[in-house]
From Swiss-Prot:
It comes from Schizosaccharomyces pombe (strain 972 / ATCC 24843). Its main location: membrane. Keywords: Membrane, Transmembrane, Transmembrane helix. One of its GO terms (cellular component) is endoplasmic reticulum membrane. This is Uncharacterized protein C30D11.11. InterPro entries: AdipoR/HlyIII-related. It holds the Pfam family HlyIII. The chain crosses the membrane at residues 209-229, 247-267, 284-304, 308-328, 342-362, 374-394, 402-422. The lineage of its organism: Eukaryota, Fungi, Dikarya, Ascomycota, Taphrinomycotina. It is a multi-pass membrane protein.
Amino acid sequence: MSTVKTFSSTETEGFKKRLLSRRHSSYQVRDEEDDVLEEFIVLKLDLFLTRLNHRMKRLEELGLPNRKDAAAATYQFLANLQASFLGTTILGKTQVSFILRRIEETYNDVLSACDTFPAKAQKALTFLEHHLRDLEDYAEKSKNNVETLMTDIKDVVEHAAKLGAQRLITLEELPVQWHNNPYIIRGYRFYTSKRKCFRSILSWHNETFNIWTHLSAFIVFFAVLAYFYPSSSSWVSSNVSNRIVRIFFLLSAMKCLGCSVIWHTFSSLSNYKHMRCAACMDYVGISALIAASIISVEYHAFVCQGPLRFIFIAFTGTLGLIGIYTPWKKWFNEYKYRSVKIFFFVGLACSGLIPMITMFYIKGTRRTVKYLDPVFKSIFSYIIGVLFYGLHIPERFLPGKFDIIGNSHQIWHIAIIVGVAFHYTGVKRFETDYEAFSCGVL
């Protein structure tokens, strides 16, 4: 940490000589000693600002500018002061007066007790040095606290990994960064190895049901895509664009289900960075499914309204890309933002209301409701699932009783499978009904 240099009497006399040598030969003074004192203090301020650059860089290295508290406000004041005099070689009375005004404007009455310029300048120097020292002490302590905290977290993770190598652990034993549901008390895995996570697919724990519901559905939809759809009569009767839309939806559904399996398989990794990547993949899969579901409706429903269809698909596609990008932001996987995540995906799904309302307006309520019947069933399934998931029902009422079977996340998984199945039946129906609906062909 930087310290302030103290001046001996010999150095003080040297300053006086330097200051007197700076005076113009025609400069007239009433009291030479007062002027020497005044310029001596100015020179000390000049020296303070010269050293400020190095000390501010040190504070920046300690991460002080990233804080959002009073210390950061003081740092910003000093940074602005430093920027105001960047490149200035020697201060004069005008520049010092500017510093005094800035201090008085920001800190009100701190200089009010001083009635002379030298007194104010000396007080300002003391004030600035005091605050800078406080910042340096604060930054060093914060750095030490962070290092201590990181050591503590590392110890907790290592302890949990040792327990996880022997048995399933409890929520209390699980490091807080891995918490996702405060009402699921037991049955947690915690491994240092990806291989152990993968092998745990075949073991019994609180993620087994979540893994196998979506893994089974993934296999079913893969079979549909790879065999049943290409060998069906609808493949033969469909044009290329209809095939592309159906394949696009099936791939998006499989992506959602597959990413979910990856997340629930590797959510037990003790490497936080890798665990978070698995979580992000889950969110990316959800975004892809929502966007693909809406686009599959827009493509068929507005086939005879080309410009409108293009606008809707472009809008939904853009939101889908945002949904694929946003989960990779650092804050997105934190539990305290869980409600934000839910509202984000609900909002993404609600973007489909715009084309739906347009369909009601253009084609009428009865025709639209009949045409979108499978979609409404799909939406209803998703809504039920979101309610259970968002409210932690039923485990919030009986914590620990639904750790392995019957908790809200498992209900949400079933709701997703049902919703995807309903929507897929809708996509198949759209291929035969879209002309009658969109183009008015009877």
